[in-house]
């Protein structure tokens, strides 16, 4: 088989030798840097058809179609209606003109009466129609020579969304037609999938074609939103950005609540979330883009079948979310019918099965409501401090950040939360270096291995994932963390794997990749050929696409053939071209004399003679004349003359063909081995998915432990509830205490936050002035409770948090014009959901209840809500400015009155933002209005009106509590690093310890720890002064000091040539001491003969240069 590669695709053709008219065989090379990688001189490269069946499909495609009828079926008509609806949203003038030329009598929308519109059997349009009939709701792109073309409806979509111009302009007598060059395929696919369209790509079978016969074509792959086109990736050296997978989503309703099914075609898996509230369902829809949305008929409430099911009563929020999307209705059994729809959408066989990734759990908290998620910044919301940004350092993004977000939106079960918390605790205290935690998308990994398109880069990344897991298994401090991560990974993937089995399978997979993939850059066989007579650039371009991919032992025969053919080519060039060049050099002539050289024609992938004026005017039988007579014009792949200055000989052409054949055979063997490796790893795909997710979780939790340590957050005591009905609640299960709570968006280490202590054993009724901090307190409590039940650190000095079954926060409401609801209606809808779901294990936080309606009736509604929540036994806070609620005859028995404090400063009342006992009837409304710039005249008039009507109630009543004395945990001792054996840099480590020991009060306490080439420092270094020694790849040392060791290591490794640097470090007490030790090490190590890269830094200070030290020079180490 032969093959051809482009930047975006690799297409194949069978070895039809009898079609070659010449004995010369031609080939191409794979050059990622070239915009068009189609070989123009030599016939193409290596087949990537899966097997003989693929060729069979190509050659028999037309036979199947001849039996089909030209009459449209009902199903075809439904597809055309679907496309008509999409075309109605087009707005570009050029697209609208193309739409006018469509005729909806076939799936392509072609008008046969227009120019190039014929659908005659056997022509290109007819062939494209057959492919379109297999995937009628996908945009069809067909490879035609140097372009990918679309016609009819698909051309209109390309012009509208991909920014392409119609072929032939806007001629009214021609069918709509558009396309893109092959080097722009990836960009075109991205534009289409970004707008929600799926694309079917049809490739040509490349190679020579018999006269009067058309090229074979086949469907090479699909591009869907969240699932890119990967065909041909195995043969290129660049990585592919893989977006988050987008599932097909189905929504239904039953007596248990709403049900949401998400089916991931790439992973062949689905998740089923049942018993959801409307708010939780909308939250999931907001955070998960879907490829297709299907709505079950059970959502319709009335018999008329109208789709506006939320016009009255429940469902308005969901309707507002769904009405802005494209959706379809379906009936029947929800799961089986939805799976059937998915198989139709993706063209899957009925035998394909999907795995349920749900892990059953009896005590998992309910997912967050949309209002709760937005008001604490779990979902990015304008004007709301983002919770995710303070949980992780800025350097941690992507997959780990998405995991933390999903963890907050769907809090884990109690036992999983405990595992996560215990993991974070261990992570915050480890002293050994940690791996880099290579993060790979599971969907990307599965698709590339399944399609056998994983390239060298991806295999190296997979091996890094496996090696990171094995690194954790080898270290005593990290192996316990690895064991703890097994359950959270099980919940995230739905895969339950035994720990020992997992480790053994990781060993096997890592060894399998290591046996095949070339990881040693110094292997001599991986160097491209070099010959004196041929430009090095030629060999580099021809061989760099396969050299260094697999170990030489697997391709010894192919490498030998390449080297022999390269030597033969060099010999042919020397024999045919060198005498001519020698003759030219021996000629002494003024300006305008003969010129000649051996040159590399990059575009034609050939080595030819390039010269002019070298032919003698008189043939005298001198040296070089015979070679000149052998020269003939060089021809390109189409047989056309390249230029007047390019020449070759039959001997050189034969040598070139043989070299290209040997090089392409080597490349074919390399890709064959890579595909075989993909097949082997497919048998361990579950282990690879599990390992990739485990590392994502590891990186997320390690990063959180580092950031929480920097912010001086704490791990709360998490108290569970008894699951037995009628059992007494566990000790502390009905009480939440947060000591020294600070708003999560403030950095505690900066000292600007106001701390509050919240000891909650019942429902609080909270009052306070405007700007007094009520909303901030509710957000802070909500965030702390959510972080606690998720197993994460909280912004407090100490905390004891029950494992709530739900956390519900309601703050300000806005109107919803989509479903015709006022802001008060929206608020009441949310209050209904909260009241109906609140239990004795819930945390309910309502800010300024009933603010959007008439005061008297709003006060009564608020009082009734408070009674209902009190009856449920939940913990929580209801804040209000409706002071009339204190005059109502409420039956609530467990209400505690709380207020946000205020104090008088120079005759003005100002808030303290402190939580106190009692009731505060002062609103500070006038003061707030003044502060916000309301005209003085307006405020004065307001004060006069107030005094005239409410003078008798003007005095504020504030009941203040005794001062609460809280204790902070400032006496915690930082654990001293535990020494660990290191096998690398022993001599250097001993020298560092010996030098620094002279300055230490307790020399025996010195520990010099190491960080490997692909490792990072542990979280215990966060906030500590460190002295470090970097061992560069050039064997020189760089000595420095820093208070941010991880950041400094990343900065060093970001520089060219320093990616593989390893480090030794020790933690000291204070930056001044670190500076002294830095200077001391620079001078002392230099005297001991070590080569330093920053020797000049030893002269910056006047200390550390002498070996005689006074007592005052002695410092202590952490």
Swiss-Prot record:
What are the UniProt keywords, alphabetically? Answer: ATP-binding, Chloroplast, DNA damage, DNA repair, DNA-binding, Mitochondrion, Nucleotide-binding, Plastid, Transit peptide
GO aspect biological process, one term: mitochondrial DNA metabolic process
Knocked-out gene: effects: Variegated plants and appearance of specific new restriction fragments in the mitochondrial genome.
Q: Which Gene3D superfamilies match?
A: DNA repair protein MutS, domain I, GIY-YIG endonuclease, P-loop containing nucleotide triphosphate hydrolases
Q: Where does ATP bind?
A: 768-775
For this protein, the record's Pfam families field holds: GIY-YIG, MutS_I, MutS_V
Similarity comment text for this entry: Belongs to the DNA mismatch repair MutS family.
In Swiss-Prot or TrEMBL terms, this protein is called DNA mismatch repair protein MSH1, mitochondrial
